[in-house]
């Protein structure tokens, strides 16, 4: 018989906000959260969330080299991990991104075109495995870390993969999600 699986924490960062109460209050306002940016309609994340990202970057020198997708994933993971007390030993992490470290890739490409050199951080900070490994490291978890990319459904695949690992008894808990920047 399959054992029951429960979602015990949830977090998001969007134009609605970051803190659960703020997200709900903004949602109930029924206002549009789109604005024009460089001629395109966008839905930017909240100023509160931008400030949280800036504070995160200040915490560790290594964080300044990370892609925005990784920083967003770390912030969301922290919100989930701090609301729980993980007693289990085998905790996996599966956070994916359909676009990955696009911001850094574009920056490194521009740098190469201008200087004909690329930063030594280009490869390690744009590798797909970067998201889950940084989330696990930040949370102090040492279980399996998995990344993948599935257009438009990466977070759902992370959830399903986490369930599969739990049902197979290869992990006691799983931190799952998707990150796009």
Language-model-detected regions and their locations in the chain:
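Active-site rim beta-loop-alpha module in soluble metabolic enzymes
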Residues: 147
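Short conserved active-site loop signatures built around small residues
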Residues: 155
């Amino acid at each position: 018989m399959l054992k029951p699986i429960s979602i015990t924490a949830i977090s998001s960062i969007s134009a609605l906000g970051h803190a659960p109460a703020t997200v709900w209050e903004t949602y109930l306002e029924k206002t549009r959260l789109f604005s024009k940016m460089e001629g395109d309609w966008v839905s930017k994340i909240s100023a509160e969330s931008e400030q949280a990202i800036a504070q995160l970057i200040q915490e560790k020198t290594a964080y300044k080299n990370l892609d925005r997708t990784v920083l967003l994933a770390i912030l969301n993971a922290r919100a989930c991990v701090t609301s729980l007390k993980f007693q289990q030993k085998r905790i996996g992490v599966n956070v994916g991104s359909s676009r990955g470290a696009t911001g850094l890739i574009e920056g490194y490409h521009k740098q190469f075109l201008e200087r004909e050199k690329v930063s030594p951080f280009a490869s390690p900070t744009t590798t797909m495995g970067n998201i889950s490994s940084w989330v696990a490291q930040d949370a102090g978890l040492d279980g399996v870390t998995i990344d993948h990319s599935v257009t438009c459904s990466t977070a759902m695949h992370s959830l399903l993969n986490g369930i599969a690992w739990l049902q197979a008894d290869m992990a006691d808990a799983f931190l799952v999600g998707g990150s796009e920047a």
